[in-house]
Structures are given as structure tokens and as C-alpha cells.
Amino acid sequence: MTNKIIQQIEAEQMNKEIPAFAPGDTVIVQVKVKEGDRQRLQAFEGVVIAKRNRGLNSAFTVRKISNGVGVERTFQTYSPIVDSLSVKRRGDVRKAKLYYLRALSGKAARIKEKLV
């Protein structure tokens, strides 16, 4: 169990509004990229294959296919470089970690859309 002072400091740091998302969802993450002296936003769109809920240390992994090559990127949920996060579509999966998608390609790697 963590100290109450540490919990209070972590709660102050977790002030960012994060939409509800789960593994299998397609998300667009706006990432702050610094190039020289200027800063811009870069969109990283892909499928959430893993999510780690640990308060301030929460993280999620997004996978996309770029020019035929699989690219995975892990983001700290409350990191200052993550500007915004939006859910593009909801996926219907039955596992918490979708690491099996790494071995699949093309149409086999598709995820059913959740009907609400």
C-alpha cells in the first residue's frame, strides 16, 4: 500500500481527461514532437493491444501497420507528451492482451466492431 502523501501527489498529477478505451479499440493519439526549437503534434493511429492500469503509472500499447511493417508504441497515459487521445472505433475482443495480433497480417488481423 502506498503512502497517503504519495497518493495525494499522484492524484494531483492525474488531471488529464482520458476517454474510456479498452484493448481492441482503434485510437488516435496526438503526440507532442519536438523538432529543433519548434513543437508540433503528430497523430499515431492504431489498435490498442495492451492496457496497464496503475494510477499515475498507467500505460497502453498501440499497434499500427506502416508501409507493411508493424509499428508498436507504448504511451504513458498521463505523460505530458500525450496531448490528446480519441477513440475512433470500438473493438469486440475477448482477451485483455492482444499480442497474438503480432503474428497475424492482412485480413486475419482485423477486429470485429462492437455493436452498441
Swiss-Prot record:
One of its GO terms (cellular component) is cytosolic large ribosomal subunit. One of its GO terms (molecular function) is structural constituent of ribosome. One of its GO terms (biological process) is translation. Keywords: Ribonucleoprotein, Ribosomal protein. It holds the Pfam family Ribosomal_L19. Gene3D superfamilies: 2.30.30.790. PANTHER family: LARGE RIBOSOMAL SUBUNIT PROTEIN BL19M, RIBOSOMAL PROTEIN L19. Belongs to the bacterial ribosomal protein bL19 family. This protein is located at the 30S-50S ribosomal subunit interface and may play a role in the structure and function of the aminoacyl-tRNA binding site. This is Large ribosomal subunit protein bL19. It comes from Pseudomonas aeruginosa (strain ATCC 15692 / DSM 22644 / CIP 104116 / JCM 14847 / LMG 12228 / 1C / PRS 101 / PAO1). The lineage of its organism: Bacteria, Pseudomonadati, Pseudomonadota, Gammaproteobacteria, Pseudomonadales.
